[in-house]
Amino acid sequence: MSFMDNLFNMADKKELKKFNKTVDIIDSLEPKFESMADSELKNMTNIFKERLANGESIDDILPEAFAVVREVSKRVLGLRHYRVQMIGGIVLHQGRIAEMKTGEGKTLVATAPVYLNALTGKGVHVVTVNDYLAKRDRDQMAKIYEFLGMSVGVIIHGQNPKVRKEQYDCDITYGTNNEYGFDYLKDNMVIHKEQRVQRGLNYAIVDEVDSILIDEARTPLIISGPGDKSTHLYSDANTFVLTLKPDDYELEEKDKAVSLTASGIQKAEVYFNVDNITDISHTELYHHINQALRAHVIMKKDVDYVAKDGEIVIVDEFTGRLMFGRRYSEGLHQAIEAKEGLKIQRESKTLATVTFQNYFRMYKKLSGMTGTAKTEEEEFKAIYKMDVFQVPTNKLMIREDLPDCVYKSEIGKFNAVAQEIIERHKVNQPILVGTVSIEKSELLSQILKKKGIKHEVLNAKHHDKEAEIIAQAGRLGAVTIATNMAGRGTDIVLGGNPDFLTKREMRRNGFKEEIVNRVDTPIEGIPVKGNEILFEAREEYEKLFEKFKQQTQEEQKQVVEAGGLAIIGTERHESRRIDNQLRGRAGRQGDPGSSRFYIGLDDDLMRLFGSDRISGIVDKIGLEEDMPIEHRILSKSIEGAQKKVEGKNFGIRKHVLQYDDVMNKQREIIYAERKRVLEGEDLQEQIQSMTHSIIEEAVTLYTQDKGFDEEGFKEHMYNLFLPKGSIEIPEIEKLNPVEITEKVYEIAMKIYTSKEEQVGYERMREVERVILLQAVDNHWIDHIDAMDQLRQGIGLRAVGQQDPVIAYKMEGFDMFDEMNKHIKEDTVRYLFNITIETPVERKAVVDVENLSSPSDGTLPTSKTVKKDEKVGRNDLCPCGSGKKYKNCCGR
């Protein structure tokens, strides 16, 4: 235990003592549960539930529940939770973040807190970054839960609402952050409560929590419908930008911002034949020019995006993966399409949106696990109220982290990287090289090809076999080049992964992909008849697995002798956490390994945020292209630059959250109103209250200093909802405002009661629900757009010495108030004027069930959009108005 003393500060050590006492209790229970028969062990779930029903808390039964899970895992998986894995489980149960190094078995760690919290019957969500991991983790860990009588579901792309509801109704559900978030939005667009699939947000464990809650924090999930704006301005702006020279615009690389200079503005005014392009009347044109500028000056092909099959596909800056189905917002995507000469797609209209920050903060309890979180603890505490506990490793970490090598230029740096690869390759040491972009990975690949080094390249262009390539990166002599953290979630096992090798061999032997994917899942209860091929494949799998297991164990010894996995970073990322993730691929479970970063002074981080002192040192030394430099000041400057960027990015995310919180509060109010309507609450009193309020406001409006404007008031009420000639009140001019309000309200209620008698009581209540839902949805969609436009222009308030956030809150509140007024007026107007000839049906503003999800992955600087709704521009609007969509909700 002495090495732990060096790893943890006093606070951590104090807490670790407490955790160890709890784990001692869990360990002491092991003999008791070991001696139980399977049936007795299975019955523990019923016993625990009974104890909870009798007043005990889940904290009370934690030691026993954890001990039960450990014993079941031994029996069904052959895996026994280490003490440190039990500590990790306790941290997760407490609603905190467990930082556990790569290879420490985070998937298994989650099983104990998942089971414990699932005993409440309120559901547990396990969140992963992609469908592959969600399904893999569900299939592997379901054996434990199902043994204990728990149902386990998985939410993946493409499932229909019926299947999704079944998965959410399980005790435990695995899925991706995107699928959970989009289902939440869709549940708040349905028009019957039975169409909702989620059953509440109780407890979530987020795997790779830093990726989801930090890297993707600013990513809004958006469900959208087709817009109505023309695309010609994108082409015009693109053609104009091609005429500009560098002096016509100013680039702020640090902030990734670009704007026209005075000469650029003058050229734009001449080109588009306008007097003052910055005038409010030319806002849209100026916006298109700015987006075209961004597309040409800031957005780089094969770094930020790729052009594939006639479309622009975003590249995730953190993983290097292609983000199919994702589009940049605010016209940037269209500007890039124009730049690349592709067909320009129309901008869409937002129907519903939420950020990951606000979605995950809705869970009653939230926890997470990752290999790298401590550097972002301040942000986790500030935004999510979660602290980070560094769980000790099961075995002592012996990886050698070598000092950075700094070179004057990129050419010198990459030549040095290639030379180190050659030297390590001579002894067959496996090497994983991390690059920051597709462009850089292909540059290094070309250098290695010229030097005759066989290697694998894993980037957004070659992502098909990502998991397999990463899993085999620990084989003898393997050289793998990967962009950033591609393959995250897949362990690199020294000597190779026998499971992947077995499945590859089976594919070569002619087994179909669907069969290969099922060979290692439970087959208990599956009849032999009709599944002969599966049983044959299972036998083949077990035979081949043993063969490859022996082979990889032999190879592992050779890899260890060669020094383990060598990690080479070709550039420092702007976040220390991303660098630590790359380092963390080596040295798992006490394996040997090494890591080193190579840095060029012209790397983005050094060029934009590095200290001027570095340039001074280099100039004094007279550094050659291929001469490395090591200096204490350099190391401090690099770390200082990273801290500077991390602080800046945290500030941006915090600032964005201030704005998003305004919209979030409004969303909560609207969704709560929808929920009330959906769940069948009698709206009669609310409709009466709305009617009274409208009349009262109108009376106030037409009662001024000169007295009551009777004619103006009547005309206003007839235009709103009352039949012409219905307001006949003797000597109305002698009544005070309160009396007028009550008299007109009596008239309105008689008319409404008469309509209700014609329609029938129950039917009228359903009509009220239908009308109110449609009014809420239609106005909410327009309000989202209006708030978005307000937010885009609010920054200018700073010029007038007004805090933009405060201005946004105040004006947003006024707009929300105005929206509620319109909802009220529309609801009452439609109800008083509706003629019911056919049975009333609830119709959604958009066909939620037919929305298709994009594939996994998101990008923080883009809006994540669900596309391919079935509502066309010229289709009848689904709200039931009888108008075309483009002239109604699609306006």
Curated annotation (Swiss-Prot):
Its cofactor is Zn(2+). It is found in: Cell membrane; Cytoplasm. SMART domains: SecA_DEAD (SM00957), SecA_PP_bind (SM00958). Its main location: membrane. It is a peripheral membrane protein. ATP binds at Q85, G103, E104, G105, K106, T107, D491. Zn(2+) binds at C877, C879, C888, C889. GO terms for cellular component: cell envelope Sec protein transport complex; cytosol; plasma membrane. Keywords: ATP-binding, Cell membrane, Cytoplasm, Membrane, Metal-binding, Nucleotide-binding, Protein transport, Translocase, Translocation, Transport, Zinc. It catalyses: ATP + H2O + cellular proteinSide 1 = ADP + phosphate + cellular proteinSide 2. May bind 1 zinc ion per subunit. GO terms for biological process: intracellular protein transmembrane transport; protein import; protein targeting; protein transport by the Sec complex. Belongs to the SecA family. Part of the Sec protein translocase complex. Interacts with the SecYEG preprotein conducting channel. Has a central role in coupling the hydrolysis of ATP to the transfer of proteins into and across the cell membrane, serving as an ATP-driven molecular motor driving the stepwise translocation of polypeptide chains across the membrane. HAMAP family: SecA (MF_01382). This is Protein translocase subunit SecA 1. The lineage of its organism: Bacteria, Bacillati, Bacillota, Clostridia, Peptostreptococcales.
